[in-house]
Regions:
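Conserved adenylate-forming
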Residues: 1-36
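Active-site glycine/GP-rich loop and adjacent strand/helix microenvironment
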Residues: 19, 32-205
């Protein structure tokens, strides 16, 4: 939905014709007591929309590598000559990928991948990484922030014109909140979405 919303807002869908990479943990699943388990970022690999699958990198074999340094080196080899248009992942992982590309080619990422248009990230606060990424990329590109967690997919950035993310209300998630300034009291009052007020900071439970 985040990517479709971006296409709707900007009118830009050219990136779907290029190569895309989602830096993530191994997508291999294990079974324990009859339940399939795996890394959250790896599980998400099984739910990439069909219209993005055909141009997706890296290869399955590379994606399943456990050693992260070996994996990123292999990803660099698989992508350095490709027409990369979308790059996604946790900022610290993507930073490592970009730095290895830069070390290999001595090029800014925006010069190496001339059609690189969209950076998708989540998992951590991006602000500490922003200056480093701007330097590594060397030019402005659009970005989409996501709010994924093991408990559910909560929100995504729905505008290139404003900061912030829109909370997903139709994903089978029941939300509860506590006012941020009451979070550390012994019995804070929990409220549901209908009682949330604009302009007040909340902790999502």
């Amino acid at each position: 939905n985040a990517i479709l919303n971006y296409i709707h807002e900007t009118g830009n869908a050219d990136f779907v014709n290029g190569k895309m990479i989602f830096l993530q943990g191994s997508p291999e699943m294990k079974e324990k007591n009859g339940i399939k388990i795996g890394r959250l970022s790896g599980i998400s690999a099984h739910y990439v929309p069909n219209y993005l699958q055909k141009n997706r990198l890296p290869s399955w074999e590379t994606n399943c590598l456990e050693d992260w340094d070996t994996k990123v080196n292999r990803i660099v080899e698989e992508t350095v000559q490709e027409n990369m248009t979308v790059i996604a992942g946790i900022p610290s992982w993507v930073q490592m990928y970009f730095e290895k590309l830069n070390a290999k080619t001595h090029l800014k990422i925006g010069d190496l991948f001339k059609n690189f248009q969209l950076f998708i990230y989540g998992g951590v606060n991006y602000e500490p990484y922003r200056a480093k990424f701007e330097n590594l990329i060397g030019r402005r590109i659009d970005s989409i922030e996501l709010f994924p967690a093991s408990e559910g997919f909560f929100a995504y950035q729905n505008s290139q014109k404003e900061k912030g993310m829109i909370l997903l209300l139709n994903s089978g998630i029941f939300y509860e909140f506590v006012k941020a300034d009451e979070f550390f009291v012994e019995k804070p009052q929990r409220i549901t979405l209908k009682d949330v007020e604009v302009g007040i900071n909340y902790v999502m439970i």
